[in-house]
């Protein structure tokens, strides 16, 4: 019997060619943080275009599979009921602060991709809650993002910067200038039922521009993976 080629069945995995790195915090305990490698692929079209990501604790062949994340546009997020919105974290601060990096992209491609991510939202659960354990233990954790200065574990940031040869501080300066908005300062969620905010702690949740700029088109997709250099 002729057996089909193995790659015929690898479509879902082969689509996850977009890589970036960031930091996830447990929503119920924002001080618990994990450096998280995102391997993402696109699905859907138009308003319902989204990224599906598998998450690992490192880039090594033996990396631990931490969990999953779905990424949708601001338009999709705002269409969700409040009961659902509590699961979705903003990416705005992570982008402008340099918390998210895509080290295999060229500088130009990375700016384009981060501009796209700026107003998106992610829903992430870590099914391996504590990556220091030998096997996954306990219930899955709903994960969150840093949303203001002083929230990130700086030792994790320094270790990530050393690993990939990047500077979060320099990346922040470049992003703010290129994208044209001030870095937002939103406190951590008060509880697991708190609905996230992108730009402000209260009032109208809108950005403070540094200069005339425009937000990326909602729902616009990026299929980027250009090698740096």
Each model region followed by its residue ranges:
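N-terminal domain-onset segments
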Residues: 1-50, 113-229
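An exposed acidic His-Trp-rich patch
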Residues: 59-150
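Short, surface-exposed beta-edge/turn micro-motifs
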Residues: 50-52, 65
